């Protein structure tokens, strides 16, 4: 909603669409990260160490690093090294950059211990090893830190060559096993969350002034993948983004390739990565995504709307990611680039989208080291 990939329409989602949030808004997210995520992972890690299971320890380290990093990206400073240590009943909040660096170190350690093992299990489907998953996550976090060199080298090391490498959460027709967007739209809160008038829908709609298509790009099929036939709702039909059994990637081939495209130092390398995504799109959507050449980004080119060549390529890469990667990675891109792609501001009371999530009230009530209320429009340290 904040990035305007989707639109909040009804009840509390209409309120969220105007950026009106409270500390209670984020209670469940914090609980999922810490109580249901990190605490369980740390128990697994401890048991793996006790049992001498180095591979399981490595898997736990990668997952632990992932959870801490994702929390730090949206909340800023968070409890980290003292979490679940009985010596610290109120874990201290540690700096966002330090937490991200520590999370990357955890993932690196996990790769060393579990790297060659398949990352597929009964929840996640992939052809990737844990080393590939770990390196792809490191690429995401280095990019958020603005470390383009390490973001690029980690993304290249991930060696994601096709969508088979996607780390997909699988879904089924079983009760509570369905795609979460499908559950929300079909079973729980129909049309609270829509595509209606969202920036992403406008970019993909060939009749809209913001349409990102051109002589080499036809986005109609992708628009129909996201948007229901009524032109308003999420597409929950078979084959749609929010279909009942549609999988959802934790990290994907497309995200990794677009990290390479953004961070590569040569235009040829940028184009190679971007065009690999376009070839993927052509197959996935059975539509036209012809390969770009550098001339397309020069003055007067079909992919240049008055920018320098470098900025025209950056715009195309970031818009492609915006229309391909749903959720928090794209949110970080908007923050990191100072809204380079021009996501509309949906509230008349501000000139920016929310810069962070608000610490939950449960932390204020239970942690003596709670740092105090920080407004959602205060940038986190890495984006300040």
Where are these regions (language model features)?
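N-terminal leader/linker segments that initiate helical-solenoid repeat arrays
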Residues: 1-16
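Acidic/polar-rich alpha-helix caps and helix-coil junctions
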Residues: 3-4, 20-186, 216-384
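Terminal low-complexity, poorly structured segments
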Residues: 12, 18, 199-200, 228-230
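C-terminal amphipathic alpha-helical segment
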Residues: 183-225
